[in-house]
UniProtKB/Swiss-Prot annotation:
Source species, domain of life: Eukaryota
The entry's keywords: Coiled coil
Name of this protein: Translation machinery-associated protein 7 homolog
Family: Belongs to the TMA7 family.
TM ranges: none
Residues covered by region (Disordered): 1-64
Bias (Gly residues): 53-64
Organism: Caenorhabditis briggsae
KW Coiled coil (keyword) present: yes
Length: 64
């Protein structure tokens, strides 16, 4: 006997999930989420164009 034969065998394909009945609230919520994700993505792209906010790195105090 090999070690892999024990237990329940996995099915080759997962069963397809049926269509969900979405209410108007669910549709609105999904639409709102997509719009927010789009805004966040645009803001991230816009922020990436400017470069780093801090440009000094480690600052030396000047004391010896």
């Amino acid at each position: 006997m090999s070690g892999r034969q024990g237990g329940k065998a996995k099915p080759l394909k997962a069963p397809k999930k049926g269509e969900k009945d979405l209410s108007e609230e669910d549709v609105e919520f999904k639409k709102k989420q997509q719009e927010e994700a789009k805004k966040i993505k645009e803001m991230a792209a816009k922020a990436g164009q400017r470069g780093p906010l801090l440009g000094g790195g480690i600052k030396k105090s000047g004391k010896k």
